[in-house]
UniProtKB/Swiss-Prot annotation:
The organism of origin for this protein: Arabidopsis thaliana
InterPro entries associated with the record: PRIN2 (IPR039349)
Coiled coil: none
Targeting presequence: 1-69
Gene: PRIN2
PANTHER family in the record: PROTEIN PLASTID REDOX INSENSITIVE 2, CHLOROPLASTIC, PROTEIN PLASTID REDOX INSENSITIVE 2, CHLOROPLASTIC-RELATED
GO molecular function: DNA binding
Assembly mode: Binds DNA when in complex with CSP41b.
Primary localization class, coarse: plastid
Key words, A-Z: Chloroplast, DNA-binding, Plastid, Transcription, Transcription regulation, Transit peptide
Its biological purpose: Involved in redox-mediated retrograde signaling to synchronize the expression of photosynthetic genes from both the nuclear and plastidic genomes, especially in excess light conditions. Required for full expression of genes transcribed by the plastid-encoded RNA polymerase (PEP). Essential for embryo development.
Lineage, broadest ranks: Eukaryota, Viridiplantae, Streptophyta, Embryophyta, Tracheophyta
GO biological process: regulation of gene expression; response to light intensity
Compartment(s): Plastid, Chloroplast stroma, Chloroplast nucleoid
Name the record gives this protein: Protein PLASTID REDOX INSENSITIVE 2, chloroplastic
One GO cellular component term: plastid nucleoid
Amino acid sequence: MASMHEALFSSRLLQVNSSFSFRCALPIISSPAAVSCAIKSTQFFKQRCRTKVRDFSLSSLSRRGFVCRAAEYKFPDPIPEFAEAETEKFRDHMLNKLSKRDLFEDSVDEIVGVCTEIFETFLRSEYGGPGTLLVIPFIDMADTLNERELPGGPQAARAAIKWAQDHVDKDWKEWTGTD
């Protein structure tokens, strides 16, 4: 049964005068007359075009180097001066934003300190321009605030990520002079 399946779906790569090649699938039909006809037409085609026939399989594609690879894009390295300037803007925004709400009680300075430290570490070590703003530091902010049992961890992290989405990529483009 396996050989019947292979015979039904076999294909050959026909090379015509070594300058032109194409794939031709030749199904094998079970009736003797049809098989004879298929063989004769194939033989005629081979003789007419002076071709050489060789087996073609998908597994040979990778060996022949027909694999398409995406080009790698290397993001720029983080810029410490940008990280410092952006961290100051972030700290000012968070102090202003969180001071307006009673949810954070008397812990605003400590909450802003935790968020700012995590954000600055991310900017200094990982942020390399648009496309590299990750959600992980903001999850870390919420987790750290909750572990320290500070009020409003999720709300502070949400305010931080909202500000970062609105400002960090834009500020990077202004800083580096790119569009």
